[in-house]
Amino acid sequence: MENKKKMIFNVLFLFLVFVATLYGVFHGEDLSEIAEILKTVNLYWLFPGVVCVIIFIWGESIIIFYMMHTLGIHLKKWKCFLFSSVGFFFSCITPSATGGQPAQIYYMKKEKIPIPVSTLVLMIVTITYKMVLVVIGLGLMIFGRGFIRTHMYDIRHIFYLGTGLNVFCVASMLLLVFHPVLARSILVKGMELLEKMHLMRHKSTRIEKLNASMDQYHTTAVYLKDHMMVLVNVFAITLFQRFALFTATWFVYKAFGLSGTNAFVIILLQSVISVSVDMLPLPGGMGISEKLFSMIFEPVFGSTLLIPGMILSRGLGYYTELLISAIFTIVANFTIGRNLRKKA
């Protein structure tokens, strides 16, 4: 019952944010003019953009397949693609993408994959996923100051905030993995402080859950110490995966027949948006992503093509991802665990 209420809340929240985003983007705009501009788009340039989205989803499935193999669990690649699709679908519709991994663990459990194993794999996926954003963010802050001044000066503060939040997130996860005793001490003291301030009720079961979590982090630490090259390989795949999705915006740029801005700048600007919004509590960064796009891509697309460009870029980067992952999540519902049920 509680899960149903949570799902209803997430769907309603997604709908409200979507409506607010539509209003914010199109209020005061000439919709007929935008529609006419969209009709002039070269569709052949959009097909590679869709391929970029598929590569993005496929990339995580390769990571899951690869890591499961190192743990002695042999899965078919198409099942890993379904696990990946489930994760992206629920991440797209929940605030801060919180619903993705619990859903993946649920579907993996249906395939008789032990929860500690699926938790380990998905934790490493999360760490490397965030690490790519940290590398982009810190790389620009240290080596790309000229780029920041030239292309994204007006949004630099939210970019710094997004980078800082991602650094904090990755640092926290690495602390939990490699220093679980210290992390446990910090968390216990933090909970005691919140209880004293009456911001949290005392629950004895909370410590038990914390201890169980620490065991999982310890397992991850042991695995990483013995498989450092696996982490390096996963990071490389994740880097390729993320930049494949960022590249979709360049194909949108070419679909309008534009030239003058090189692919590197467009792809990097799209990555800046991802770094900035990734940790914000909005499904798919909806609303704020559109705002940032309009601020940093106007010199690239021009004022006339800015909103049509935004529609296609977000259409590929978020809504196409949502649609594709939704379709394969439905497939997962009918196929994951099916053979096991037949044998039973």
Question: Language-model segments: which ranges?
Answer:
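A short amphipathic helical element positioned immediately N-terminal to and/or at the very start
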Residues: 32-40, 108, 213-225
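Short, membrane-interfacial amphipathic segments enriched in basic
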Residues: 196-217
